[in-house]
């Protein structure tokens, strides 16, 4: 089995679950108790990165090690787009996945990280199919929508997942003779376009992130075809993080059962304060 197949296999194990952003060991323990399949270790959730401004970088290795020491579930951490040295440091710490993330300030405006040169699997964001296939071509083992992290607004994640699905359906139904032109237009590797044509799906798991704040948001993304959900600011910026985290985990498990969704949505306290997406968009970082 090739390295990429092993990496994809690790990503497949996260399907049907919730990955939660945490900023300290206490939050990591809450996330694990609530049923998270993995945690994302970072110093500031996206809502605070937006509010504080400045340059957002890889988290302090000490924080990441503290979080890794208190949970048994996989731990992810973020590196800046193109910052392969941050990725080397994260790999040396033993994190389970690296997210080459638009939430952090990009280090390279032209080049993403060569993910094939690492043993640790990478997560990457996308806004459309061409972007997804370019990241997979670089070695990403897991794709997620970018959405608009830190907003509590699901609209961009919905738009992006629908666009990816629309693009996949178009390629699936295209004539084989059209695939090279499609690859050219998408700026995507031809072999990956032919994979989508034959299989009607991405060659790696496709998750959703960016703006998920409620159980209904999580279920919406699952019904639209996401295979798992990342939740950032939506849990620990709410009034009752544990209860909301449990509810979102249940919503991902029972995303097609409206009665259960209604039950788990009751009495969760105030959600995070949402903001509109008509400012600098993190999703426009990277290409």
Swiss-Prot record:
Protein name: Pyridoxal 5'-phosphate synthase subunit PdxS
UniProt GO BP: amino acid metabolic process; pyridoxal phosphate biosynthetic process; pyridoxine biosynthetic process
Gene (UniProt): pdxS
Positions annotated to bind D-ribose 5-phosphate: 21, 150, 211, 232-233
Gene Ontology molecular function: any one: pyridoxal 5'-phosphate synthase (glutamine hydrolysing) activity
Catalytic activity: aldehydo-D-ribose 5-phosphate + D-glyceraldehyde 3-phosphate + L-glutamine = pyridoxal 5'-phosphate + L-glutamate + phosphate + 3 H2O + H(+)
EC number(s) given by UniProt: 4.3.3.6
Pathway stated in the Swiss-Prot or TrEMBL entry: Cofactor biosynthesis; pyridoxal 5'-phosphate biosynthesis
Chain positions recorded as D-glyceraldehyde 3-phosphate binding sites: 162
InterPro entries from the UniProt entry: Aldolase_TIM (IPR013785), PdxS/SNZ (IPR001852), PdxS/SNZ_N (IPR033755), RibuloseP-bd_barrel (IPR011060)
Active-site residues annotated for this sequence: 78
Keyword NAD tagged: no
Top enzyme class: lyase
């Amino acid at each position: 089995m090739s390295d990429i197949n092993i990496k994809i296999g690790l990503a497949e194990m996260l399907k049907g679950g919730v990955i939660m952003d945490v900023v300290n060991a206490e939050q990591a323990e809450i996330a694990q108790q609530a049923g998270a399949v993995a945690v994302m270790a970072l110093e500031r959730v996206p809502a605070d990165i937006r509010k504080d401004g400045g340059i957002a970088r890889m988290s302090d290795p000490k924080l990441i090690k503290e979080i890794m020491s208190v949970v048994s579930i996989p731990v992810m951490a973020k590196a800046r787009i193109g910052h392969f040295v941050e990725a080397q440091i994260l790999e040396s710490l033993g994190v389970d996945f690296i997210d080459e993330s638009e939430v952090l300030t990009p280090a390279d405006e032209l080049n993403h990280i060569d993910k094939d040169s690492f043993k640790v699997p990478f997560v990457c964001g996308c806004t459309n199919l061409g972007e997804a296939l370019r990241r997979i071509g670089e070695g990403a083992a897991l794709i997620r929508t970018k959405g608009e992290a830190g907003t509590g607004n699901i609209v961009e994640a919905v738009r992006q997942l629908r666009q990816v699905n629309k693009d996949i359906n178009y390629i699936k139904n295209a004539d084989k003779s059209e695939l090279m032109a499609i690859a050219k237009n998408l700026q995507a590797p031809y072999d990956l376009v032919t994979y989508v044509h034959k299989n009607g799906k991405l060659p790696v798991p496709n998750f959703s992130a960016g703006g998920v704040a409620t159980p209904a948001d999580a279920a919406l993304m699952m019904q639209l075809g996401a295979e798992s959900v990342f939740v950032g600011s939506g849990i620990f910026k709410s009034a009752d993080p544990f209860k909301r985290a449990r509810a979102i985990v249940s919503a991902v498990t029972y995303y097609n059962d409206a009665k259960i969704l209604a039950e788990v949505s009751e009495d969760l306290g105030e959600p995070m304060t949402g903001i509109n997406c008509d400012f600098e968009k993190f999703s426009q970082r990277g290409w």
